[in-house]
Amino acid sequence: MAEFPKVRMRRLRKANLRWMFREARLSPENLITPIFVDENIKEKKPIESMPDYFRIPLEMVDKEVEECLEKDLRSFILFGIPSYKDETGSSAYDQNGVIQKAVRRIKAEFPDAVIVTDVCLCEYTTHGHCGVVKDGEIVNDETLPIIGKTAVSHAESGADIVAPSGMMDGMVKAIREALDAAGFESTPIMSYSAKYASNFYSPFRDAAESGFKFGDRRGYQMDIHNAREAMREIELDVKEGADIIMVKPALPYLDIIRMVRERFDLPLAAYNVSGEYSMIKAAIKNGWLSEEAIYEVLISIKRAGADLIITYHSKEIAEKLQ
């Protein structure tokens, strides 16, 4: 291999050349915008722990989507704040539930918008856990039919992609079988395959009113110390029928994103989660970082190997990319 002075790495770093040789690129098409749909409010409600982010009333969700489409953001993931909760999360699969109504409302106005729906029970249960609880334990197998039923109700409402996030063993298989049996063989599953029991979720739990009433989620979400375990989780999801795999969170787990990219050929999503968002926004508001840090964060996730990024920064970064 040639050396200096024959090789001068700075030759390709001239201002009018740099863009030609960028190995990772970011565009609005790569971004998925989260929307918190709340059927209990009539006006947008600021989320205290997520600066500049809001809960959106059901009646205004189509307007929120329209604003994003004007910025070339075409893909959305919906999280619901329902009007009622119970022990088993039955409002998750209610055909008149908040997500079901939101999907129908959006699709009626914007049929080409890509709607991903979060399939989990934590927002719909009184205890705030992601599965059925018996004697203080989250019961895996009894949860599976409920999340299967929930996924079908989302597909019936018009969801383009369903995204199970509860980290129940066998959840992808249960959803794939339920969708196929209901005639939705072509509905893709984006699995939260490697979802870590992270401290970076706290603002989301405020936003979605999904905080747990007892214990924690370390019995079903992944241990933050483990990397090889993530490969096992993803391999199982692939075998069960996942079409898209995901790593969550993103920034503290760039090593996992890279490992997944090198081992699996499926489309890979990464979730730039609420704590990552709030951390960066707080630093910007205090003058400790410039807004350019947002782009650097997102391009680092892309560079690590993610095809898609779920991010609360989508609208502000899309404006800069236009």
Swiss-Prot record:
The cellular component terms of Gene Ontology attached to this UniProt record, alphabetical and capped at eight, are: cytosol
User: Which residues are involved in binding Mg(2+)?
Assistant: E233
Q: Where does Zn(2+) bind?
A: C120, C122, C130
Annotated GO MF terms: porphobilinogen synthase activity; zinc ion binding
UniProt keywords (A-Z) are:
Heme biosynthesis, Lyase, Magnesium, Metal-binding, Porphyrin biosynthesis, Zinc
Question: Under which EC number(s) is this enzyme classified?
Answer: 4.2.1.24
Which pairs of positions does the record mark as disulfide bonds?
none
Protein's pathway: Porphyrin-containing compound metabolism; protoporphyrin-IX biosynthesis; coproporphyrinogen-III from 5-aminolevulinate: step 1/4
Query: Where 5-aminolevulinate 1 is bound, by residue?
Result: R205, R217
Q: Does the keyword Ribosomal protein apply?
A: no
Question: What residue stretch is flagged as signal peptide?
Answer: none
Q: Where is the active site?
A: K195 (schiff-base intermediate with substrate), K248 (schiff-base intermediate with substrate)
Q: How is the cofactor bound?
A: Binds 1 zinc ion per monomer.
Q: Name one GO biological process term.
A: protoporphyrinogen IX biosynthetic process
- Residues reported in the UniProt entry to bind 5-aminolevulinate 2: S274, Y312
Task: Look up the domain of life of the source.
Answer: Archaea
Family stated for the protein in its record: Belongs to the ALAD family.
What is the role of this chain?
Catalyzes an early step in the biosynthesis of tetrapyrroles. Binds two molecules of 5-aminolevulinate per subunit, each at a distinct site, and catalyzes their condensation to form porphobilinogen.
Oligomer and partners: Homooctamer.
Name of the featured protein: Delta-aminolevulinic acid dehydratase
Which gene name does the record give? hemB
